[in-house]
């Protein structure tokens, strides 16, 4: 029997596609037409705004796709044993496209795209970049990321896809590895935001929840020596940000606990 993503249970009931007008720092009902013409240069202007709050039950039908940063959603509350996590250590989009074997949070190994494509989520969260920025050019990373997002759109037609910002690192890590310096990460996030919205996907500015006033990973969220990965407190803050930055839909309405749709 083949191994699958770490999950709580099989899910279904995909909602109809929806796409909002996205505005920075504004809590309002959001709508947007697909395939938008994107001209904003600041990713915050393209991000999903605050929009009430959903309960953690929302995560039972969510799928997280990414690298070891996304693996934390399988390890820590409130998403552990709730969300489905298809995240693989030291992974970049080109490896997923080529169906390389990846290492899951529990240490087992599986062909990555084969693992992802059999899922039936109601919402998808995608995050790549930390490994790719170190191992390849920015242009190559963005091209492969674009191709992967197209592949996800085709496979999961009608399912809302949230493309998350690359998360901040510590200032010290940025000195050690210049591609992961937060000023550079912000530039790449601007490109990712444009890419996502131009494809009719949603852009989630996780930096807003995880960065300090200087744009570095908050000290109380740092979880490992590498200045990249986070502790349970950081993941709890990240998950809370997701629950307060979702797009309204008839499907999501069942999880609303406060806000304009409560």
Regions found by a protein language model. Give the residues of each.
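Sec-exported extracytoplasmic/periplasmic mature domains
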Residues: 74, 129, 146, 150-157, ...
């Amino acid at each position: 029997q083949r191994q699958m993503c770490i999950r709580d249970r099989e899910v279904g009931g995909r909602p109809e596609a929806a796409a909002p007008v996205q505005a920075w720092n504004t809590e309002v009902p959001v709508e947007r037409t697909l395939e938008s013409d994107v001209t904003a240069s600041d990713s915050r202007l393209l991000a999903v705004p605050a929009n009430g709050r959903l309960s953690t039950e929302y995560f039972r039908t969510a799928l997280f796709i990414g690298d070891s940063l996304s693996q934390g959603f399988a390890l820590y509350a409130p998403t552990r044993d709730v969300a489905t996590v298809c995240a693989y250590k030291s992974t970049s989009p080109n490896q997923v496209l080529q169906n390389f074997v990846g290492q899951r949070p529990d240490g087992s190994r599986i062909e990555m795209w084969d693992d992802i494509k059999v899922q039936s989520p109601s919402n998808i969260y995608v995050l790549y970049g930390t490994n790719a920025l170190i191992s390849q050019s920015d242009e190559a990373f963005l091209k492969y990321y674009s191709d992967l997002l197209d592949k996800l759109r085709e496979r999961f037609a009608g399912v809302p896809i949230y493309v998350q910002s690359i998360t901040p690192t510590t200032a010290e890590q940025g000195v050690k590895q210049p591609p992961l310096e937060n000023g550079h990460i912000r530039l790449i996030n601007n490109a990712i935001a444009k890419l996502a919205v131009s494809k009719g996907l949603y852009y989630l500015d996780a930096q807003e929840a995880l960065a300090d006033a200087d744009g570095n990973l908050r000290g109380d969220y740092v979880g490992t020596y590498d200045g990249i990965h986070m502790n349970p407190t950081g993941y709890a803050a990240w998950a809370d940000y997701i629950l307060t930055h979702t797009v309204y839909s008839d499907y999501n309405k069942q999880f609303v606990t406060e806000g304009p749709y409560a």
